[in-house]
Amino acid sequence: MRLQFFLVMAVATLATISATRVPDDANLQSVNAPVQTVTRSRRFLRTADTDIVYEPKVHNPGKKQVFIEDKLQKALTDPKKNKKLYARWYNSGFTVKQVEGGLDQNENRELELTYKNLALGYAKYYQARRSQEAK
């Protein structure tokens, strides 16, 4: 007989011997009865806050909803955020043409003016940084 078959038989024998147990060693946990006779003490209902009245949301047609365009326009017109964005673009090595090309790919007409102003701002920032590095 080959050594591989002998090893497989030895492992199988050890596995069957060690798998048998004495049922007295089992630790059984006690479980609650499936039929709940006294459920009143175990109920978790929201009966304590019946005095609080939650008003439903009312649709106000006069109030304009805030969409992502509004949030973007607000963020992109903030000078502090723009300088951070310009610095990140400059440190990443983007040229003015790359930034203009990337910002021109939008299909949103509401943000077109904001994107153009952002590209012009980056062009000014780019020229200023280039002139500082040239000195």
Swiss-Prot record:
This is RxLR effector protein Avh5. It is found in: Secreted; Host cell. The keyword Transcription does not apply. Its main location: secreted. Residues 1-19 form the signal peptide. The RxLR-dEER motif acts to carry the protein into the host cell cytoplasm through binding to cell surface phosphatidylinositol-3-phosphate. A motif (RxLR-dEER) lies at residues 43-71. A 1,2-diacyl-sn-glycero-3-phospho-(1D-myo-inositol-3-phosphate) binds at residues 81, 83-84. Effector that suppresses plant defense responses during the early stages of pathogen infection. Suppresses cell death induced by effectors and PAMPs in plant hosts. Keywords: Secreted, Signal, Virulence. Belongs to the RxLR effector family. One of its GO terms (cellular component) is extracellular region. It holds the Pfam family RXLR.
